[in-house]
Amino acid sequence: MSNRTPPEQLTDRLFATERNPEDFRFDASVARVFPDMIRRSVPGYTTIIPMIEVITEQYVQPGSHCYDLGCSLGASTLAMRHGIPYPDCTLVGVDNSEAMIERCEHYVALDDHDLPVTLRCEDILSTELSNASVTTLNFTLQFVPPEQRLALLTRIGDATLPGGVLVLSEKIRFESDAEQAIQTRLHHEFKRANGYSDLEISQKRAAIEKVLIPETLADHRDRLQRAGFDQVLVWYQCFNFVSMLAIKNS
């Protein structure tokens, strides 16, 4: 397949028939349907991606590095690319899934922009970070074991320049059981409205609940501040999905 040929995009039917339960993995089968899966599963995703371009344009610094950690197929990476006006910036996408990186390479090649993109098939917990003005963790931290999240965010905070930012998008949980029930029900209705059956919703939930560990907004705010960020604000929320902007002042 030529790098100028778009990868085949399929409708997500991975959980449409009964299957033995196993943990969710970002393998080749998921990579093939990922654009459809995330659009139909994550409310607000199609708003968050173009706003990452806007945020990048506001906070990117000349000669700095920009990172998309857990880049999957590169939607955030390309949004950042189009928000960077400086040709001396370095843009890096990192993902530990070979299937995702392989497909991401095609999307990067098809994108009409001159800024080079470096893709690394690496663990974000150990990938090299430095001189960062904009970093994104777009629905990625939730898949990192909770006991390793502070260390990762501290590494990002240490690598971030004064005036730099982290965009952190996450599925969250709520302190109140009543609110949790309402937000979960609304999220499931969103997925039904996008064509998922009750079987698909329940089977995906069973597959993902052991690997996607959501936390409260208070948990995220506290950890980001401990990691070296001075301001943390929620710039977007739809049901139990949020995107935060963490700013390092000094």
Curated annotation (Swiss-Prot):
Q: Note the InterPro entries from the entry.
A: CmoA, Methyltransf_25, SAM-dependent_MTases_sf
Q: Which GO terms describe its biological process?
A: tRNA wobble uridine modification
Protein task? Catalyzes the conversion of S-adenosyl-L-methionine (SAM) to carboxy-S-adenosyl-L-methionine (Cx-SAM).
Could you state a single Gene Ontology molecular function term?
carboxyl- or carbamoyltransferase activity
What does the annotation say about its assembly with partners?
Answer: Homodimer.
List the coiled-coil residues: none
User: For this protein, what is the EC number?
Assistant: 2.1.3.-
Residues binding S-adenosyl-L-methionine, per UniProt: 45, 70-72, 95-96, 123-124, 138, 205
Q: What is this protein called?
A: Carboxy-S-adenosyl-L-methionine synthase
Q: What family is this protein classified in?
A: Belongs to the class I-like SAM-binding methyltransferase superfamily. Cx-SAM synthase family.
Keyword list (alphabetical) reads: S-adenosyl-L-methionine, Transferase
EC top class, as a word: transferase
The record's section on SUPFAM superfamilies has: S-adenosyl-L-methionine-dependent methyltransferases
Catalysed reactions listed for this entry: prephenate + S-adenosyl-L-methionine = carboxy-S-adenosyl-L-methionine + 3-phenylpyruvate + H2O
Is-annotated flag, keyword Transport?
Answer: no
Instruction: Check the record and name the Pfam families matching this protein.
Output: Methyltransf_25
Q: What NCBIfam families does this protein map onto?
A: carboxy-S-adenosyl-L-methionine synthase CmoA
Q: Which CDD domains match?
A: AdoMet_MTases (cd02440)
